[in-house]
UniProtKB/Swiss-Prot annotation:
This is Queuine tRNA-ribosyltransferase. Homodimer. Within each dimer, one monomer is responsible for RNA recognition and catalysis, while the other monomer binds to the replacement base PreQ1. One of its GO terms (cellular component) is cytosol. Substrate binds at D89, S90, G91, G92, F93, D143, Q187, G214. GO terms for molecular function: metal ion binding; tRNA-guanosine(34) queuine transglycosylase activity. InterPro entries: ArchSynthase1/Queuine_TRR (IPR050076), TGT (IPR004803), TGT-like_sf (IPR036511), tRNA_ribo_trans-like (IPR002616). The lineage of its organism: Bacteria, Pseudomonadati, Pseudomonadota, Gammaproteobacteria, Enterobacterales. Zn(2+) binds at C302, C304, C307, H333. Its cofactor is Zn(2+). PANTHER family: QUEUINE TRNA-RIBOSYLTRANSFERASE. The active site is at D89 (proton acceptor), D264 (nucleophile). Pathway: tRNA modification; tRNA-queuosine biosynthesis. It catalyses: 7-aminomethyl-7-carbaguanine + guanosine(34) in tRNA = 7-aminomethyl-7-carbaguanosine(34) in tRNA + guanine.
Amino acid sequence: MKYELQKTDGRARRGRLVFERGVVETPAFMPVGTYGTVKGMTPEEVKETGAQILLGNTFHLWLRPGQEIMKLHGDLHDFMQWHGPILTDSGGFQVFSLGAMRKIKEEGVTFQNPINGDKVFLSPEKSMEIQYDLGSDIVMIFDECTPYPADWDYAKRSMEMSLRWAKRSRDRFDELNNKNALFGIIQGGVYEDLRDVSVKGLVDIGFDGYAVGGLAVGEPKEDMHRILEHVCPQIPADKPRYLMGVGKPEDLVEGVRRGIDMFDCVMPTRNARNGHLFVTDGVVKIRNAKHKSDTATLDEHCDCYTCRNYSRAYLHHLDRCNEILGARLNTIHNLRYYQRLMASLRQAIEEGKLESFVEYFYGRIGKPVPPLSPQLTD
């Protein structure tokens, strides 16, 4: 993988990630294909929304169908028939979200398989081996996702263990002679001093890109913005920056303003299945009765298959009847909305008009523009 930085506007960056399997224009949003599928969508449909890279879930694919089934097909690309780049998370977040079902030690994490109750062990080394078999174009290190709230002492211990695990991940990745990219994950909770230690430690080890982890876990938005403003300038400018698990359209805009290049989130797909649709003017809850006889398109600014062909009334009808097609059409639209938003952000950075676009974006959804810290507006 090669990262090319093409243009900046304030802290925002316009670039591209070049892989053997294709080019990803950044800032980029990655749809989530947890079990080797973006729910309800064929790979061709996902590609038509404008997506250039997907996220797969190491934890879930390891438990089912397992490494052996994956290897029978070649790798995850062949298994799911997506031939563009794939980033896989390390399984860390899923393991730590199991709560009482898991036990953390220096060696790794022992937990109860949520599918069949078996006792399972996942370590940095094992995560690297699974992701190697998946053929991931971007491999994520195995880390502990520090929960929120966490006091300074807990966040420090967690971050320090994540650093040790980062080194073990790097070592096993290199032993496997994996020629793909490996990203480090910056931890440290909402504490700037701990984030500083994490960034320095990861940069000293050396990675192909750097993710900001442990955000979007319940902390106030102001804390997320503060940490991003503090951390992003410390990440080497020639490496991509990835904000994990984020998020709402506003979060993508704010991440880009602060220097983030890559995002992923289940929100567009999960919300689509619940009839919660993102449009230029905010959100449409398609189940609401006011859409029953609305012949208008969902979003007049959108060029997706759904908006080109169907009315709000039809989407409302499908939702009320719990028809599978409704969930599919909603998903097509939400994914296209996210990709159009990213394309607009890229264009605005290219033209040096990012803040003008930000004002337009918030004006359409009827919200004030969140302030940048003074050093970002100098």
